[in-house]
Structure formats: structure tokens, C-alpha cells
Amino acid sequence: MKKNIFYSFIVAILLSSCQGMDLMPADKMSDGDYWLTENDFKIYANGLYPSLMKFNGDDNLAQYDQKADLSTSYFGFNSVSNGRWLPSESDGVWDDCYAYLRKIHILLEHVDALHTTDPKILRYKGEALFFRAYQYFKLLNRFGDVPLVTHSLDIDSPELFMERTPRKEVEDAILQDLYDASLLLPKKSEMAVAVTVRITRGAAVAFRA
């Protein structure tokens, strides 16, 4: 009997002490601590830019010219036409694009959740819209019809198994994103010299053209 009382006492102490435990790791930030300032959105948006900067990779902007008939032997771009491309091969474009799209949608959702009219924050929504258009542009060029996802997905989201969206609908979404981005992005002349490497209104307008 005494043992039962003793064990019950120990369990009660352990349970009461658990109530004060921190479930969030002390070295991690929660959404409640982030997405509050212009700099928070800027730092997150910085993570979208590597998709434009790879030279010898699938995210290289120059590839769309290199895949023309003047450059068919460069980087093995003619591997399909000469029969060297195997059905089992994948260069990761599909996975990479949708991974970036999830990052983009997280940014868009947090901007919208603020209900802000601050142009300094809304410019990063413009950048995210530009990058969403760019990712779908890459998917469209490679695959044609692709699933058009417009929000972040979880592991149990039904959209993970959605059918491909017709090419025309994806094209319209790209053009709309670029138009909306052009309304939020600053002109290059409005930017400080130190930040002129970021996406501008002119870039969105030129891409849309």
C-alpha cells in the first residue's frame, strides 16, 4: 500500500512538472515570432532568388535560349532528339519547382494575413507573385499541363493528387500573377542603389510581354 502511495506521489509530481515544459525548442522561431517586420519578409524572400542564379542547372534562365537549334549540343540538351534520354531519368525540375512554389505560397499567405497596406512589405508579395509565375513558366515549358496549386499544401492536402490543369489556365494564371506583381513592385528608379538587384516592376512587365 505504501509503495502504491509513493508511486502515485511520484507520478503526480512528474505530471505537474510537465505542464510548465516548453514544447517549442528555445533555438527555433514560431510563426508568432516571425512575419512581423519588413525585414522578416525580406529575409524570407531572399531564399527565392537562388532559382534565378544557377548557371549549370535547370533553374538557369539562359537555358531557354540554349535549348534552341543554335545550342543543341550544349549541356546535352538534345538528349531526347538523339535517343539518349531514358524514361527513368529525371532532372528534378518538377520537384524543385513545386518545392519553391510551397515557399512562395507561405510568403503570400503571411502577407495576406497581415492585411497591410505598407508598400515596403507588399513589394515582397510582388516578388513572390513574380517567382510563382516563373516557376509555372518553367513547368509549362517542360511539361505542358501541370497541377495549378495556389496555396501551401500539407502532407494530407487533397491537392497532392489533383489532376493536371489545362495549359491555357496555367498561362492565364502566369499572366495574372505578373500583372499583379507589377502593381506591387517598385520601379528601379525608386530603389536605393544597394537593392537594385531585386525584382523590379520593369522585370515583371518585361516578363509578361
PLM feature spans:
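Bacterial Sec-dependent N-terminal signal peptides
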Residues: 1-27
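Membrane-proximal, proline-rich intrinsically disordered regions
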Residues: 18-62
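Short linear capping/connector segments at secondary-structure termini
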Residues: 27-30, 83-85, 151-158
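Conserved, well-structured interaction surfaces
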Residues: 38, 42, 50-54, 75-143, ...
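Short, solvent-exposed turn/loop segments enriched in Gly/Ser/Thr/Pro and often Arg
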Residues: 59-76, 147, 196-198
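Short, well-structured active-site flanking segments
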Residues: 140-152
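Aromatic-lined, polymer-binding surfaces characteristic
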Residues: 149, 194-205
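Active-site neighborhood of glycoside hydrolase catalytic domains
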Residues: 208
